[in-house]
Regions:
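Surface-exposed charge patches
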Residues: 37, 41, 68, 117
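Generic structural signal for well-ordered secondary structure
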Residues: 31-32, 36, 61, 111, ...
């Protein structure tokens, strides 16, 4: 059952995390080897089949440092990096290595920026980056103004025993969410499109509601019998106020 699979994956991650937390950093200064061991088992528990890429991936006459792909998921790209930067000061500040360019690497950008660049340069829509501590699902930004990604704090999830959050992670990140036929978008993309449609409907409904509220309040201000109403009507007659003034004040009041 699904519950049993989630429980097994959770138990496996917690056991692996104990070994990960007790690792010896002397032989792995950037944490790359230990993070890869941890996350390869993590992805396996969610039915990913990671195919390691010994050389950079070429796309559109460019090379990208994408160490893993998932062939069964349309070559879904995955970046796994160490959780240490090699810079003591940065590590002490707890800077996320997904947003930092690690010393000594040939990657010219941070892992997050590398993945985003790859997605925007190819037809791939989604990619995953992780340093063992944090996991991000990134979407290309071809049609978006803001960066779009979902982040899970794996360290806090395990160390603070947030099983409910792990259930959410499993249900969201399982391979079934990214598999698709040639005609249909994957479930993740279907969810994304529905969220945009839902947001548009909400904004349209909100716009109608705001307009109706402004009409009702506007009539009350102009036609009301109070001293303030009379003063406003007089201001309009004197040219001290106009419809734009009323509109601005109504918007300020509503929001």
């Amino acid at each position: 059952s699904l519950t049993a699979k989630i429980d097994n994956a959770w138990s496996s991650l917690r056991n692996d995390w104990k070994l990960f937390a007790e690792r010896n950093m002397l032989r792995d200064p950037y944490g790359t080897k230990s993070v890869r061991r941890l996350m390869e088992r993590f992805f396996s528990s969610q039915d990913y089949q990671l195919d390691y890429q010994p050389t950079q991936i070429e796309a559109n006459e460019r090379k990208f440092d994408i160490p893993y792909i998932c062939p069964e998921l349309g070559q879904l790209p995955v970046i796994i990096v160490g959780d240490k930067t090699g810079d003591v000061e940065l590590d002490m500040m707890d800077k996320c290595t997904l947003d930092q360019r690690v010393k000594g690497e040939h990657r010219q950008k941070s892992p997050h920026a590398t993945m985003l660049d790859y997605l925007n340069s190819t037809e791939h829509i989604y990619g995953i980056v992780t340093n063992g501590q944090v996991l991000r699902l990134i979407r290309n930004t071809g049609q978006l103004v803001k960066l779009t990604y979902i982040e899970f704090d794996l360290r806090r999830m395990v160390e603070e025993d947030h099983y409910a959050e792990f259930c959410l992670l499993f249900r969201l990140m399982h391979t079934s969410r990214f598999s698709h036929s040639s005609d249909d978008a994957c479930i993740m993309e279907q969810w994304f499109n529905r969220s945009i449609e839902s947001g548009n409907r909400i904004r349209a409904g909100l716009s109608d509601a705001v307009q109706k509220a402004m009409e009702i309040l506007g009539r009350a201000v102009v036609c009301g019998k109070g001293d303030g109403n009379e003063a406003f009507r007089q201001a309009i007659m004197n040219g001290e106020a106009n419809s734009q003034t009323l509109n601005k004040e109504l918007i300020h009041f509503i929001y």
